């Protein structure tokens, strides 16, 4: 028997995978782990992808050092 699920396929590095799994608990979508770098977001739609992208961008901005951020 074949099962079809609507969702999104996501390829990412392992730390990003862990962050997406963390976000899934807050945003209420199901994550199916396929392997170390691939996830399937069941029930995910464009709204979910935009939310994930925004949260990842925020995390990267917090963890990026810039010489220009330093107070002079």
Swiss-Prot record:
Signal peptide: none
Keyword DNA damage among record annotations: yes
InterPro entries recorded: TFB5-like_sf (IPR035935), TFIIH_TTDA/Tfb5 (IPR009400)
GO biological process, one term: nucleotide-excision repair, preincision complex assembly
Compartments where found: Nucleus
Pfam families xrefs: Tfb5
GO cellular component assignments: transcription factor TFIIH core complex; transcription factor TFIIH holo complex
Keyword terms: DNA damage, DNA repair, Nucleus, Transcription, Transcription regulation
Similarity annotation: Belongs to the TFB5 family.
Its job: Component of the general transcription and DNA repair factor IIH (TFIIH) core complex, which is involved in general and transcription-coupled nucleotide excision repair (NER) of damaged DNA and, when complexed to CAK, in RNA transcription by RNA polymerase II. In NER, TFIIH acts by opening DNA around the lesion to allow the excision of the damaged oligonucleotide and its replacement by a new DNA fragment. In transcription, TFIIH has an essential role in transcription initiation.
Subunit-level organization: Component of the 7-subunit TFIIH core complex composed of XPB/repB, XPD/repD, gtf2h1, gtf2h2, gtf2h3, gtf2h4 and gtf2h5, which is active in NER. The core complex associates with the 3-subunit CDK-activating kinase (CAK) module composed of cycH/cyclin H, cdk7 and mnat1 to form the 10-subunit holoenzyme (holo-TFIIH) active in transcription.
PANTHER family the record matches: GENERAL TRANSCRIPTION FACTOR IIH SUBUNIT 5
Identification of the protein by name: General transcription factor IIH subunit 5
Gene transcribed to yield this protein: gtf2h5
